[in-house]
Amino acid sequence: MSNQQNDAKRAAARRVIQDFVFDGMTLGLGSGTTSHFFVRELGQHVAKGLQLTCTTTSRATSEVARDVGIELSDPNEMNEIDLTIDGPDEIDRRFNMIKGGGACLLWEKIIAHASKRMICICDETKIVNCLGQFPLPVEIVPFAWKQTERRVERVLAEQGLHHVPIIRRMGGGHPVITDSGNFILDCHCGAIITAPEPLEIELNRIPGVVENGLFTREATGMVVGYFDGSSYVQLR
C-alpha cells in the first residue's frame, strides 16, 4: 500500500470522526485496513476524553481497538447501535458494496443491520462503476461444501453470470476459516454485476450459504479520501 493511499485512508478516517462521531454514541467498528485507520484515529479522541460504547465486526478489529485504548462491549448487551463505520472492497455510486476480503462479512452484516446508520469509509480506489472486479465472497458451512459450491455456480448463471471461476479461499496451504468457523468461496465474476440486489437475495437462499459479500441496503453514506489528503461526504 502506497503512502498516498495511506494518506487517503487517514483523510477519510479523520473526516468521518469530524462529521459523524459524537460524545455518548454507540459505535460499530468495521473491519479492513481503512476501518483500522479509523479505529486508530478514534483511539486518539478516546484518550482525550471522548465517551463511546463500541463493538467490532471482527477479532482483528478488536485487537486494534484494544491496542489504542478503546474499551469494547458485547453486542448482546447493547441496544440498537447508533452508527457503524465500515469499509468496502468495492462500492458503486448507488452505495452497493462488495465486502468480505478479510473474511468478516457475516459479522459485518450483522452489526450493520443492528445499527441506525452505516457510513462507508474508503479511499478513492474503491469507487467503481460496476461491482465484481473484486471477487465476491460467499461464506458457507464446511459440511458438503462442494454441493453448496455447485448451487452457488447455478445461481450465478441464473443471474446472468456464466462460467464464473469459484475458488475456496486458502491461506498457508489450508482453507481460510472465518471467525464463525466457516469457509469462503471467492466468485471471480468480473466487473459485470449489474443487478446486485437480487443476486444477494438468491445466494442467501441456498442451503449451506451463511451470508454473501453483497451489501445493497446498508450504507446510508460514504466518506471518501483522496490521495492529495482531501475527502468528501456523500449521503444516500
Curated annotation (Swiss-Prot):
The keyword Isomerase applies. One of its GO terms (cellular component) is cytosol. Transmembrane segments: none annotated. Pathway: Carbohydrate degradation; pentose phosphate pathway; D-ribose 5-phosphate from D-ribulose 5-phosphate (non-oxidative stage): step 1/1. Keywords: Isomerase. PANTHER family: RIBOSE-5-PHOSPHATE ISOMERASE. Belongs to the ribose 5-phosphate isomerase family. This is Ribose-5-phosphate isomerase A 2. It comes from Yersinia pestis. The lineage of its organism: Bacteria, Pseudomonadati, Pseudomonadota, Gammaproteobacteria, Enterobacterales.
